[in-house]
């Protein structure tokens, strides 16, 4: 059998993964080495391309994520050769990867950008949906059109967006924290956003622009071949645009929040009936909860002893790095979160193998105002920087750490508000000797600044505050701001004039 295998193809540079990190890395390498073939190995027939990139400030950036067929990438970069197949095995000692189609690809430098997989609260249950990529988002839309009630488990960015976007369907949202959006916000910011959630949504929404899906041309057989339910790359910003997230009922928002609880058990209808369990109706306006007489396809028992029936469950409980295909026979150093450990040049513990994006775990001495979060902005930055490091190593040059790792900076949208997160925006790891300064105009803006020893360490800006560039500079230059006191957030003082 071995003799029938096609001869290995060789590429000086091989990149695995068609998400933002992998495509950015491949594009950067293709630009740097126009006469070299860059191999991009991806299990999916579509790739994620960064378009309309805008540098808002030194570090803050905005871009669109466009989902395209891999042929479009080849048109832009003729020296990128896309291999549409999953990875079966990595033979690091032989500098070779074996793809699912049985082919071998020899590399001189390899970058692993295979992303992460959703942590499902329950594997193999047809009523539990994990939303991670476009295919699962479209499956969710299909299920929602028939749904009267759904349950969302989790408190990350996708859960936040879903809860705001879903209409015409009862939503029970279970989170293990005291407040929503714990990864991104403290209780104050959560309260600010929750008031927006409870208010009825107007039909006219601000037009989003970041994600466009151009996937109509993709082949059906290619989709099934890619096993997209397992390996899809992460959704970009505004992933729900173009999806009509409406249930069967004629109302806008009906959300019930269950805090400080997790899923204890999931029952299918037959099991629920046999066990003679009792479930609650959807809680309404502080009325006492009553037993639900309606039968549902699936039931969720929470750790607070409440049981609710629903049409299906959305598992939005985070991700785990997708390292599985690469571990067998290779002694990678792994981080506590299961990611491939990378040094300050995005190099893993194995020779000539780099990693970027959700699959990796940073293990260098981090800047005091930067932290790794598995977000699309960091995927782009890491993919870009990994390519620079691979290029420098192959030509024997040295390279400085990229400036984007000096300060954590992320801009996004939640509940139709612009949200900017800077530095240690939630006082992550700062100990108890920090203080917070707040300014809040209900329905318009929420500003929180994290101070330590008179210096700004982080900030959360919700709404159109126009303070991001000033605050970015203040965090970066670590100027002592003690003398300004509360004036820093005084709306009557133009703070930018102070620090021009």
From Swiss-Prot:
Which Pfam families did the record assign?
A: Pyr_redox_2, Rubredoxin_C
Which enzyme class? oxidoreductase
PTM annotation (N-acetylmethionine): residues: 1
Q: Name one GO cellular component term.
A: sarcomere
Q: Where in the cell is it found?
A: Nucleus; Cytoplasm; Cytoplasm, Myofibril, Sarcomere
Cofactor(s) this protein cannot do without: FAD
Q: Which UniProt keywords apply?
A: Acetylation, Cytoplasm, Disease variant, FAD, Flavoprotein, Limb-girdle muscular dystrophy, Myofibrillar myopathy, NADP, Nucleus, Oxidoreductase
> Any keyword Lipid metabolism?
no
Keyword Thylakoid tagged:
no
Which Gene Ontology MF annotations are present? NAD(P)H oxidase H2O2-forming activity
On cofactor binding, the record's note says: Binds 1 FAD per subunit.
**Coarse class of the protein's main subcellular location:** nucleus
Q: Which residue intervals are annotated with compositional bias (Basic and acidic residues) in the record?
A: 213-228
**What GO terms describe the biological role, i.e. biological process, of this protein?**
cellular response to oxidative stress
Outcome reported for the amino acid change (mutating residue 155 to S): In MFM8; also found in a patient with limb-girdle muscular dystrophy; decreased function in cellular response to oxidative stress; no effect on subcellular location in the nucleus and sarcomere
Q: Where is this region: Disordered?
A: 211-235
The residues forming a coiled coil are none
- EC number(s) given by UniProt: 1.8.1.-
Summarizing the function annotation, the protein's role is: Probable FAD-dependent oxidoreductase; involved in the cellular oxidative stress response. Required for normal sarcomere structure and muscle fiber integrity.
Give the record's disease field: Myopathy, myofibrillar, 8: A form of myofibrillar myopathy, a group of chronic neuromuscular disorders characterized at ultrastructural level by disintegration of the sarcomeric Z disk and myofibrils, and replacement of the normal myofibrillar markings by small dense granules, or larger hyaline masses, or amorphous material. MFM8 is an autosomal recessive form, clinically characterized by slowly progressive symmetrical weakness affecting both proximal and distal muscles, with normal to moderately elevated creatine kinase.
- Family (UniProt): Belongs to the class-I pyridine nucleotide-disulfide oxidoreductase family. PYROXD1 subfamily.
Name-wise, this protein is Pyridine nucleotide-disulfide oxidoreductase domain-containing protein 1
Provenance organism: Homo sapiens
Q: Which gene encodes it?
A: PYROXD1
